[in-house]
Regions:
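C-terminal hydrophobic helical "lid"/dimerization subdomain
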Residues: 1-3, 243-247, 296-348
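Short Gly/Pro-enriched turn/cap motifs at secondary-structure boundaries
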Residues: 7, 18-19, 51-57, 75, ...
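Glycine-rich beta-strand-centered segment in the early N-terminal region that forms part
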Residues: 20-34, 47-92, 131-134
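Mid-domain Rossmann-like dinucleotide-binding core that forms the NAD(H)/NADP(H) cofactor-binding site
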Residues: 134-214, 218
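Glycine-rich cofactor phosphate-binding loops and adjacent beta1-alpha1 units
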Residues: 155-158, 203-281
Length: 348
């Protein structure tokens, strides 16, 4: 088969790769659409791969074309997305249902062959069926949607309160939508890109704020009557927005860090005192899994994609390339300011 093979740093090529074979308990999926995740970028451009050669890709959708021995709930022709985490199921965290914290996990698209290929073989329990009326490109967004709702679950989100979304990338927009689905009183989205803010508005934000404006914090405070936001979800993984979360939080707020920073983050004594005096609850959120595996995050995404309440907008996708042009797609990330949304790879 053909695949996008990473042979070394900045050396990703559309090349021949051994077609994976189905084993007991697995299914083979013909990949129709697969998104480039932010975590793929350092693996390709910044020496972040675990080994070479490797086929990356973990946000995908496609059709089941072969079913391994012992698989009962999947059939040839089923449309599926894939949960990329492959937990050991034996360590203490797995036994408690904390699969994302597994000590001995594998991961489709980084530690084993991923979806930047014509075919991928995955454990049957990782294949998430969805209604075939959902377009492949939308279904390739399963994983970022589940990351978003996992953050809400980690923050014990219950609705009926004010919500600040920091960062309007793919995960930020899904976080916004989940907050709205589950009854937010008011949602305000923050970003530096007017195009992303326009998308946030279309997806249900009550107000949007460009943080490049000098008076943005004053306006943000006016919206809540200077009470702060009862729920703050940081999705950008940027030290600026992570510190901003502390300033926007209300007394007794829930603050959740979903984004992952790639540079050092320094908390000043003033910021720390801000947290202490407000007595807000700060939590991290890692991946998107719960018991029974892969979890309600995946079931809820399938359901709300089907009902149409969890929306897909063409604005999610910045560029679309055939898999054969994968090197061209990753070249854009050498200047991240060129990329304003998800880059989607497709197989004809």
């Amino acid at each position: 088969m053909k695949a996008a093979v990473l042979f070394g740093n900045e050396d990703i090529r559309y090349d021949t790769w051994e077609t994976p074979e189905v084993k007991p308990g697995t299914v083979k999926v013909r990949v129709r659409a697969t998104g480039i995740c932010g975590s793929d970028v350092p693996r390709v451009l910044h020496h972040g791969a675990h080994f070479y050669p490797v086929v990356l890709g973990h946000e995908f959708s496609g059709d089941v074309v072969e079913v391994g021995e012992g698989v009962k709930d999947l059939s040839i022709g089923d449309t599926v997305s894939g949960a990329p985490l492959v937990p050991c199921m034996n360590c203490g965290d797995c036994q408690q249902g904390n699969f994302a914290l597994c000590k001995h996990y594998s991961f489709i698209g980084s530690r084993q062959q991923g979806s930047f290929a014509e075919y991928v073989v995955i454990p049957a329990q990782n294949a998430v069926k969805y209604d075939p009326s959902i377009p492949y490109k939308q279904a390739a967004m399963f994983e970022p949607s589940t990351v978003a709702i996992h953050g809400l679950l980690q923050a014990d989100y219950k609705g009926g309160e004010t919500v600040a979304i920091l960062g309007c990338g793919t995960i930020g927009i899904f976080t916004l939508q989940w907050a709205k689905i589950f009854g937010a009183k008011k949602i305000v989205a923050f970003d530096i890109d007017d195009g992303r803010l326009a998308l946030a508005k279309r997806m249900g934000a009550d107000d949007v704020i460009n943080t490049l404006k000098s008076d943005f914090m004053e306006y943000a405070n006016e919206i809540t009557g200077k009470q702060g936001y009862q729920n703050v979800f940081e999705t950008a993984g940027n030290p600026v927005t992570m510190r901003m979360a502390f300033d926007l939080a209300a007394n007794k707020a829930h603050v959740c860090f979903i984004g992952t920073p790639h540079t050092d983050l320094t908390f000043t004594p003033k910021l720390w005192e801000n947290m202490n005096r407000k007595e807000f609850h700060l939590t991290g959120s890692w991946m998107s899994y719960s018991a029974p595996f892969p979890g309600r995050e995946w079931d809820l995404t399938a359901h709300y994609f089907q009902t149409g309440e969890l929306k897909f907008d063409i604005g999610f996708i910045f560029r679309e390339y055939p898999l054969s042009r994968v090197a061209e797609a990753f070249a854009l990330y050498k200047d991240p300011s060129q990329v304003h949304g998800k880059i989607m790879l497709t197989n004809d």
